[in-house]
């Protein structure tokens, strides 16, 4: 599974969380750990891209005008 497949964001995020959990155990053989790490990087990039696309698509209707959604400065996602 890669971050560029047709799976949904939630499925990709769940898989990424599972990979992190498995890597954090420190009990994987080297080859499996490296493969999971690579998959995790691909999934993270895919999730990041989907979030950015969603952020760009969000519009806020204010004063009769559609405006782009601006992430609040203090939001954790605003640091991306």
Curated annotation (Swiss-Prot):
<keyword id="KW-0269">Exonuclease</keyword>
<keyword id="KW-0378">Hydrolase</keyword>
<dbReference type="GO" id="GO:0005829">
    <property type="term" value="C:cytosol"/>
</dbReference>
<dbReference type="InterPro" id="IPR003761">
    <property type="entry name" value="Exonuc_VII_S"/>
</dbReference>
<dbReference type="InterPro" id="IPR037004">
    <property type="entry name" value="Exonuc_VII_ssu_sf"/>
</dbReference>
<comment type="function">
    <text>Bidirectionally degrades single-stranded DNA into large acid-insoluble oligonucleotides, which are then degraded further into small acid-soluble oligonucleotides.</text>
</comment>
<protein>
    <recommendedName>
        <fullName>Exodeoxyribonuclease 7 small subunit</fullName>
        <ecNumber>3.1.11.6</ecNumber>
    </recommendedName>
</protein>
<dbReference type="Pfam" id="PF02609">
    <property type="entry name" value="Exonuc_VII_S"/>
</dbReference>
<keyword id="KW-0540">Nuclease</keyword>
<dbReference type="GO" id="GO:0006308">
    <property type="term" value="P:DNA catabolic process"/>
</dbReference>
<dbReference type="GO" id="GO:0009318">
    <property type="term" value="C:exodeoxyribonuclease VII complex"/>
</dbReference>
<comment type="similarity">
    <text>Belongs to the XseB family.</text>
</comment>
<comment type="subunit">
    <text>Heterooligomer composed of large and small subunits.</text>
</comment>
<dbReference type="GO" id="GO:0008855">
    <property type="term" value="F:exodeoxyribonuclease VII activity"/>
</dbReference>
<keyword id="KW-0963">Cytoplasm</keyword>
């Amino acid at each position: 599974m890669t971050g560029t497949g047709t799976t949904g964001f939630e499925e990709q995020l769940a898989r990424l969380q599972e990979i992190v959990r498995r890597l954090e155990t420190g009990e994987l053989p080297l080859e499996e750990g490296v493969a999971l790490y690579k998959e995790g990087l691909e999934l993270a990039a895919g999730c990041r891209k989907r979030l950015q696309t969603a952020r760009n698509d969000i519009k806020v209707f204010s004063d009769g005008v559609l405006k782009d959604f601006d992430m609040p400065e203090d939001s954790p996602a605003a640091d991306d």
